């Protein structure tokens, strides 16, 4: 079986599970988001092992688990974010000499990713539509960038740390993301105008930046993949890097322009 076939099969299985949990919502999706965050943190600590100490690992795991519990108990977005930021600050101060910010960055990256996904799904009637919109934008970006880049080739996007990505792939991915976002919006009769395509484009760009940033991190520690959990995709970070970056941006937009506890309302506020 070729790597492409393995990659497609893994994507189909993961996509099916993800969409089902998205449909179910509630605690099930919150637990799913927390599981993603925990897997991300595990891979981050393994990648940056030379910058970790026993304290940073133990503290990070404990703080991340409590952050997850706050999400499950629905204690409020601002309280949960404040708790997460406090933990990151403690790690930053106490572990700066040995970690140079890597332990704190890993905790925030994993924790805020789980928080963003969980709160975006949140309550009905907006949550399901918003998460599907996010998935449509990010998955359209990934698929179109991959095949467009392979078909057209051309100048490299970031050859120093991601030699396979091209400008043609990035542009094709962004165009597909706008189309995917508009399709979801049209199916749910979301408001028209410029808001949806602009948001889809921004999310696509940030998704690709998230992908490149994760590639940069791996290069810093001489790793090709973040892990081996997902056949054809490497690790969890390799699969969700773009998704969680876009989710974080979408959550921030929702928290600022709608409500921190119901960020999905941004999707219907254009």
UniProtKB/Swiss-Prot annotation:
Predominant location category: membrane
Transmembrane regions listed in the UniProt entry: 19-39, 53-73, 76-96, 101-121, 126-146, 183-203, 248-268
Swiss-Prot/TrEMBL catalytic activity: a 1,2-diacyl-sn-glycero-3-phosphate + CTP + H(+) = a CDP-1,2-diacyl-sn-glycerol + diphosphate
Membrane-protein topology: Multi-pass membrane protein
UniProt KW tRNA-binding keyword: no
Signal peptide: none
Disulfide bridge positions per record: none
The keyword Flavoprotein belongs to this UniProt entry's keyword annotation: no
Alphabetically ordered keywords of this record: Cell inner membrane, Cell membrane, Lipid biosynthesis, Lipid metabolism, Membrane, Nucleotidyltransferase, Phospholipid biosynthesis, Phospholipid metabolism, Transferase, Transmembrane, Transmembrane helix
Gene Ontology, cellular component aspect: plasma membrane
Compartment list: Cell inner membrane
Catalytic class of the enzyme: transferase
Biological processes per GO annotation: CDP-diacylglycerol biosynthetic process
GO molecular function: phosphatidate cytidylyltransferase activity
Source species, domain of life: Bacteria
EC number of the protein: 2.7.7.41
Pathway involvement of the protein, from the record: Phospholipid metabolism; CDP-diacylglycerol biosynthesis; CDP-diacylglycerol from sn-glycerol 3-phosphate: step 3/3
Family according to the record: Belongs to the CDS family.
Name of protein: Phosphatidate cytidylyltransferase
Organism, as annotated: Brucella suis biovar 1 (strain 1330)
């Amino acid at each position: 079986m070729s790597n492409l076939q393995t990659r497609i099969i893994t994507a189909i299985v993961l996509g099916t599970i993800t969409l089902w949990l998205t449909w179910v919502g509630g605690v099930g999706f919150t637990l799913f988001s927390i599981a993603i965050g925990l897997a991300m943190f595990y891979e981050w600590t393994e990648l940056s092992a030379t910058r970790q100490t026993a304290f940073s690992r133990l503290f990070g795991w404990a703080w991340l688990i409590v952050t997850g519990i706050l999400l499950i108990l629905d204690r409020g977005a601002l309280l949960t974010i404040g708790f997460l930021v406090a933990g990151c600050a403690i790690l930053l101060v106490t572990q700066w000499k040995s970690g140079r910010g890597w332990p704190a960055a890993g905790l925030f990256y994993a924790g805020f990713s789980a928080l963003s996904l969980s709160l975006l799904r949140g309550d009905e009637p907006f949550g399901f539509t918003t998460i599907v919109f996010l998935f449509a934008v990010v998955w359209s970006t990934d698929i179109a960038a991959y095949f467009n880049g392979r078909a057209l080739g051309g100048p490299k996007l970031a050859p120093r740390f991601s030699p396979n990505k091209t400008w043609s792939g990035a542009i094709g991915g962004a165009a597909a993301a706008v189309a995917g976002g508009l399709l979801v919006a049209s199916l749910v009769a979301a408001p028209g105008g410029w808001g949806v395509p602009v948001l889809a484009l921004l999310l696509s760009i940030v998704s690709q930046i998230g992908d490149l940033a994760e590639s940069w991190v791996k290069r810093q520690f001489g790793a090709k993949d973040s892990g081996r959990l997902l056949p054809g995709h490497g690790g969890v970070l390799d699969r969700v890097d773009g998704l969680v970056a876009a989710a974080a941006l979408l959550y921030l937009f929702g928290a600022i322009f709608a409500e921190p506890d119901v960020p999905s309302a941004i999707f219907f506020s254009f």
